[in-house]
A protein has these predicted regions:
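General "foldedness" signal
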Residues: 50, 63-65, 71-74, 98, ...
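Cysteine/selenocysteine-centered motifs that mediate thiol-based redox chemistry or coordinate metal-sulfur cofactors
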Residues: 93-110, 158-172
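Short amphipathic alpha-helical segments, especially helix-boundary/capping motifs
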Residues: 9-14, 96, 100, 123-125
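Short linear motifs at secondary-structure transitions and domain/linker junctions
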Residues: 22-28, 35, 94-99, 109-111
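Structured interaction and signal-relay segments at domain junctions
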Residues: 41-106
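Juxtadomain coupling helices with adjacent low-complexity linkers
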Residues: 2-35, 39-41, 133-172
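Aromatic-enriched hydrophobic runs in primary sequence
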Residues: 11-16, 31, 59-61, 103, ...
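Extended hydrophobic
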Residues: 103-152
Length: 172
């Protein structure tokens, strides 16, 4: 088993444990969405951003340079977060570790589910996953990392303890 996958999975579990909210509402979503937009703009990149409590859209923004494909990727990543209550990137690495896919393991169609970085669970401390923060537009590990960076700042958690190291391969 690849030790970098194992260490990334441990870091992803820590992120999901530490980056939980005491409360979350439409104002929280608006502020986080705005911070995500600013973080991406500071990098000179473009993404689509979606924040939802499952079934209730709270924030959406498609930056100039994104396409309808980014919106579909968001939907598919969000479906993974909702079904598994984990980040879409954690699910990608879990399946890679097992050398399988969602289609092979559970029969889930690729048209509705994608295990790619950029979907992160909204979880109230001590509670279930209630929604997802999802972005699409940059490489998947970077999509995931931008969300973690903004959430760590918002929740006053040390990014140095939560950020993933740079990827070793071009796939992530």
């Amino acid at each position: 088993m690849d030790s970098s996958i194992e260490s990334d999975l441990a870091r992803l579990a820590l992120q999901e444990e530490q980056l939980q909210f005491e409360t979350f509402n439409a104002d929280t979503a608006w502020q986080l969405g705005t911070l995500l937009k600013q973080a991406v703009e500071a990098r000179g990149k473009a993404v689509a951003i979606d924040i939802q409590l499952f079934g209730q859209p709270l924030f959406f923004y498609a930056m100039p340079g994104t396409t309808p494909d980014n919106i579909d990727w968001i939907r598919r990543k969000r479906n993974v977060v909702q079904r598994f209550q984990r980040s879409s990137y954690a699910m990608r690495l879990e399946l890679r570790k097992k050398q399988t896919t969602l289609t092979e393991q559970l029969g889930l169609p690729l048209r509705d589910y994608v295990v790619a970085g950029g979907g992160f669970p909204i979880r109230l401390r001590g509670s279930a996953c209630i929604g997802a923060i999802t972005i699409s537009g940059v490489p998947m590990r970077e999509d995931h990392g931008i969300i973690v960076e903004v959430l760590a700042s918002w929740l006053n958690r040390p990014l140095s303890e939560l950020a993933l190291p740079p990827a070793d391969d071009m796939d992530d």
